Structures are given as structure tokens and as C-alpha cells.
UniProtKB/Swiss-Prot annotation:
Disulfide bonds: none annotated. GO terms for molecular function: 4 iron, 4 sulfur cluster binding; iron ion binding. Keywords: 4Fe-4S, Iron, Iron-sulfur, Metal-binding. It comes from Buchnera aphidicola subsp. Schizaphis graminum (strain Sg). Homodimer. It comes from the Bacteria. Belongs to the NfuA family. [4Fe-4S] cluster binds at C150, C153. It holds the Pfam family NifU. This is Fe/S biogenesis protein NfuA. One of its GO terms (biological process) is iron-sulfur cluster assembly. Involved in iron-sulfur cluster biogenesis. Binds a 4Fe-4S cluster, can transfer this cluster to apoproteins, and thereby intervenes in the maturation of Fe/S proteins. Could also act as a scaffold/chaperone for damaged Fe/S proteins.
């Protein structure tokens, strides 16, 4: 899935040795499946790991990836380029801009997850939020969960009805209803 060169792995090991114990690596894509897709690497503390993350084992460290972007990371490579000036990580993900939401071979769940990542989450991320598809019930109800700044936000009702639900029902006629399964707790993380 993600080929990390030996030089890059050694670089990560060196960087992680200076971080708090338990800190690992996260690979992410902002706006996956769009022409504006951007790949990145960041530290990932134990508190940053979410239920929908996939844990990849490397030599002396782990990489966490949101399950919904796995298809965009096909044949991706992370390398460390060293020259006279210094060093730089390179991240090549040839499928990061591939739009999988139109792929009819994908399951409905995968298509909705990709749709959320491409069309809804870029807007929500401006407020530090994100929406995830938990599952599709037998009666074609999409069960979703908001995280980050959306959790506990006073505008969540509007976001749910006017953005998320309208768009899902419009683009996926097989979905009959959208239900928010988030246990909304207002706190410092909430946007409003």
C-alpha cells in the first residue's frame, strides 16, 4: 500500500525518538479524489487514533491511515532525498486525485465515504470538523457520525439537514434517510 523507503523509515525512527512515547506517524490526504488533493505526513499521538483508522506496521513504528482514503494511496511511496543542501521527504501518491465516487464497481458504502471526503469534509474541515459514514442499515438509512469541531457545535442541525443529508439523498437515491449517531458534547473542540 504505502512503500516507505529504508532512508525514510530511518528518518521517521529518528524523528519519533524525540517525541513523547507512543507517538507514531499519520498519512493523510486533504481533498482526496479531487484535483486539489494534497498528501501529507504528520505525527499521530495515541489520542489522535480513531476507530476508522488502519494501523500499518513498519520497522519500529506504525503508520495510521483513515480507512476511507486507502484506495487513494494505491502504489504510493514515501522517500527521503538527501543532497548537499539538506534532506526532504517526498510523498508520491499517483491515485490521490482519482475520483472513485463514480466507480460503479465500488460498494455503496465506499462511494458514500468517498463522496463525504471529496464533497462534504473539505467544507467541514474549515471549522476543524469531519463527518464519517458508520454504516448503511438494511432499510437504506445512512448512519453518520460527526467528529472534531462539528461535535457539539450549535450549528450541527443545520449542517446535518442542509448540507450532509441533502447532498447524500441527492447523489445517492438508494439512501432513504440520514441519521446522526454522534453523542454531541459541547466543549472547547466545538466550533460554535
Amino acid at each position: 500500500m504505502i512503500n516507505i523507503s529504508d532512508k525514510a523509515q530511518n528518518h521517521f525512527i529518528s524523528l519519533l525518538s524525540k517525541e513523547p512515547i507512543g507517538t507514531q506517524i499519520r498519512v493523510f490526504i486533504i481533498n482526496p479524489g479531487t484535483q486539489n488533493a494534497e498528501c501529507g505526513v504528520a505525527y499521530c499521538t495515541e489520542d489522535d487514533v480513531e476507530n476508522h483508522d488502519i494501523k500499518l506496521n513498519y520497522n519500529h513504528f506504525f503508520v495510521y491511515v483513515d480507512r476511507s482514503i486507502i484506495s487513494f494511496l494505491k502504489n504510493s511511496e514515501i522517500d527521503l532525498i538527501v543532497d548537499n543542501v539538506g534532506s526532504q521527504l517526498t510523498f508520491k501518491a499517483p491515485y490521490a486525485k482519482q475520483n472513485y465516487s463514480k466507480n460503479t464497481a465500488s460498494s455503496l458504502k465506499e462511494r458514500i465515504e468517498n463522496f463525504l471526503n471529496n464533497n462534504i469534509n473539505p467544507q467541514l474541515s474549515m471549522h476543524g470538523g469531519k463527518v464519517h459514514l458508520i454504516q448503511i442499515s438494511q432499510n437504506n438509512t445512512a448512519l453518520i457520525k460527526f467528529t472534531g469541531g462539528c461535535n457539539g457545535c450549535s450549528m450541527i442541525g443545520t449542517t446535518l439537514k442542509e448540507i450532509v443529508e441533502k447532498k447524500i439523498l441527492s447523489f445517492f437515491p438508494e439512501i432513504k434517510k440520514v441519521i446522526d449517531q454522534t453523542d454531541h458534547l459541547h466543549g472547547n473542540h466545538s466550533f460554535y
